[in-house]
Amino acid sequence: MEKMVKFELKYDELLEKIPYKYAIPVVVAKRAEAIREYARPFVITEDENPVSIAFMELSMNYIRIKNEDILKALIPKVK
């Protein structure tokens, strides 16, 4: 029997791992849409909200941002 995952979203901790504050919601929205329409979640949880599940998967490294090199080029260089 698989263990249910209890999850508390900490967006600040997620930003430390993935420093692209505008990319995170886009990735989560796309994954949530996939879960809602056809994909099976990578985690087992009591929460049925696809957005919460997608945030959980991203924070637990089950999904990742593709083309991260392109996103790195968009980070402004502060002098």
Swiss-Prot record:
The keyword Nucleotidyltransferase is assigned to this record: yes
Family in the record: Belongs to the RNA polymerase subunit omega family.
GO biological process terms, semicolon-separated: DNA-templated transcription
GO molecular function: DNA binding; DNA-directed RNA polymerase activity
Protein name, per record: DNA-directed RNA polymerase subunit omega
Gene Ontology CC terms: DNA-directed RNA polymerase complex
Assigned keywords, A-Z: DNA-directed RNA polymerase, Nucleotidyltransferase, Transcription, Transferase
Function: Promotes RNA polymerase assembly. Latches the N- and C-terminal regions of the beta' subunit thereby facilitating its interaction with the beta and alpha subunits.
EC number(s) per entry: 2.7.7.6
Reaction equations catalysed: RNA(n) + a ribonucleoside 5'-triphosphate = RNA(n+1) + diphosphate
Subunit structure of this chain's protein: The RNAP catalytic core consists of 2 alpha, 1 beta, 1 beta' and 1 omega subunit. When a sigma factor is associated with the core the holoenzyme is formed, which can initiate transcription.
InterPro entries referenced in this protein's UniProt entry, alphabetically: DNA-dir_RNA_pol_omega, Pol_omega/Rpo6/RPB6, RPB6/omega-like_sf
